[in-house]
């Protein structure tokens, strides 16, 4: 059956070119010389993600820059507190600003490139965004000039369903008004995008980038595997 609509993931797909956010942040720590090892960083990253997911820290009107700043504040606060503090609070404040400016600039560049691809896809098909986010995805899309490209936005914080539950992709299919087999999902996370998209009956294109770990995946599950977002335009049936 022909593809008639597309569902895109946001985080890791449109803003970091397929790289897991943990990798993006860790590289920022390394570039700016934060004196912690990767194991300590991973503990801080997981701590911050859990806090952001369970507490109303992010406001609906928070830009991505503000969101990233709050994330870094949690991570570096974790690393500069307690008996095993790795850095001083003064150093944490400086690292926070420097890493924020660095990574935010990279995200601006990546989303600008993603916008070109999305505009090309939109010329062919209706598009829906399906994202696990903090309740401010609308603000973030506007910040990076991505608003108006999607016919609908399905955000986990708004609908009460999170990936990897296939139900969130079914909501995306319903928003398109199509059948699952007429819909292709494009995402960077094998476990949170590709597997549940296939379980929902959709076609799937995996943006394979630098993951959180070095696991091996069954690349026969997605219908196509790409390493750059722009390659989605060259998938034969898209």
Where are these regions (language model features)?
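Asp-based, Mg2+/Mn2+-dependent phosphohydrolase catalytic module
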Residues: 1-4, 39, 82-84, 90, ...
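N-terminal helical cap/lid subdomain that shapes the substrate entry/recognition surface
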Residues: 1-115, 138
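Switch/coupling loops of ABC transporter nucleotide-binding domains
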Residues: 125
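Short conserved AdoMet
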Residues: 122
């Amino acid at each position: 059956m022909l593809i008639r609509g597309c569902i895109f993931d946001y985080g890791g797909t449109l803003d970091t070119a397929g790289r897991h956010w943990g990798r993006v942040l860790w590289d920022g720590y390394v570039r700016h010389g934060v004196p912690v090892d990767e194991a300590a960083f991973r503990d801080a990253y997981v701590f911050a993600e859990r806090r952001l997911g369970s507490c109303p820290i992010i406001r609906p009107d928070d830009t991505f820059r503000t969101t990233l700043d709050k994330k870094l504040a949690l991570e570096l606060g974790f690393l500069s507190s307690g008996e095993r503090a790795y850095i001083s609070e003064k150093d944490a404040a400086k690292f926070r600003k420097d890493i924020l400016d660095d990574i935010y600039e990279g995200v601006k560049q990546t989303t600008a490139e993603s916008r070109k691809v999305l505009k090309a896809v939109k010329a062919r098909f209706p598009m829906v965004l399906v994202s696990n986010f903090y309740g401010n995805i609308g603000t973030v899309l506007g910040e990076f000039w991505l608003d108006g490209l999607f016919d609908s936005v399905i955000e986990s914080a708004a609908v009460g369903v999170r990936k990897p539950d296939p139900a969130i992709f079914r909501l995306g299919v319903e928003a398109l008004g199509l059948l699952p087999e007429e819909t292709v999902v494009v995402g960077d996370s094998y476990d949170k995008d590709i597997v549940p998209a296939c379980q929902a009956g959709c076609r799937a294109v995996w943006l394979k980038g630098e993951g959180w770990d070095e696991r091996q995946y069954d690349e026969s599950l997605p219908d196509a595997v790409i390493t750059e977002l722009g390659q989605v335009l060259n998938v034969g049936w898209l």
